[in-house]
Amino acid sequence: AVKRYWRYLVARYGAYPVVWCMCGEGIMPYYLSETREADAAQQKSGWTEVMAYVRSIDPYANLISIHPNLKGRQQVEDPSLMDFEMLQAAHRDIGSVARSIEQVTEAVGAEPVMPVIEAEVNFEGILGRSWQNVQRLNFYHAVMRGTAGHNYGANGIWQMSTVEEPYGRSPHGRSWGEIPWQEAAQLPGSRQVGLGGQFIRRFPWWELEPRPDWIRCEPDWTWDWPADVVIYGPVCVGIPRQLRIVYMPMVWTPGTIVAIEPDVSYTAYWFDPCTGKDIDIGPVEVSDAGEWTPPLPGECHDWLLVLTSTETAS
């Protein structure tokens, strides 16, 4: 029955520029199942067969993936059947930021190499948390570590909950939250993640390299626990001699840009991920040691620092 359904979908929509997602929550058993391990194994085998079938019958070779309960590669027996990997880091607020960082790092470096998308993490407002600050952390930590895209979600939208007909309780007996979709669509994280997408597309993002060796930042009082070094530590990417981008999840102390090429002149600016505004800094004045510490922006929260070579900028 599932193959027949997919055969219909391919025949009906295959000529359009579509992407095939085999299913949602690939190998996650039903909430109340008493045979969870056996169910997951059967689902993994079944979706592998269906994915191979769709690939064999689609004459347009549309991209194929699967929405996972954790990692896309774990949902099928042969990950090479997928064109890109979806991830899900769950909805544990700050805890899922750390999980997403771990998942993205592993997936981007895995074989076979394929594009990676953080497909579901921390729907805004779910369980009364995961608000806009967490949305920004999830987005920038993912794209700065090599993902090819990012999905934003909001509680209330995924259920299409309304005032007249709230979604209510899931089969496990609990409600994820009852904000109606009309309100959820206006949550600030949506706009701020959208601003992040506009920001990343300013640059040839597919050419960016991870460069942790270009930034030095010491922990300060805003880092409460040892694990905060992962969540609140800076992430740097760039293109040698052309571009440096640093995401600083908490700018109390701005950190120092290091290993600046002595024969390259840079100009710099701050990007505010809350408002989308640029704050010009001007020419980068490099020390004899090849280092530069930027001036603080006006308000302490997360910021992005951009250094562009004057030759590239012109």
Question: Where do the model's predicted regions map?
Answer:
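Aromatic- and carboxylate-lined catalytic core of secreted/periplasmic carbohydrate-active enzymes
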Residues: 123-126, 135-282, 293-314
